[in-house]
């Protein structure tokens, strides 16, 4: 069975655990519609991605 050679210091343990925290998702304001969207994702209202029309927008009922 693997056994650590040295005791892990509280600093090292904390640095390892710092990546476990949940981070709030980031949003950017869309230049065309002004709505918030995730970066590197398609704007579902307009169907635009990086200045190109990639989806046909749904008709609002």
Swiss-Prot record:
Biased composition (Basic residues): 1-16
A Pfam family it matches: Ribosomal_L32p
A Gene Ontology molecular function term of the record: structural constituent of ribosome
Basic and acidic residues composition-biased segments: 28-44
GO BP terms in the entry: translation
GO CC annotation, single: large ribosomal subunit
InterPro entries noted in UniProt: Ribosomal_bL32, Ribosomal_bL32_bact, Ribosomal_zn-bd
UniProt protein name: Large ribosomal subunit protein bL32
Origin species: Rhizobium leguminosarum bv. trifolii (strain WSM2304)
Lineage: Bacteria, Pseudomonadati, Pseudomonadota, Alphaproteobacteria, Hyphomicrobiales
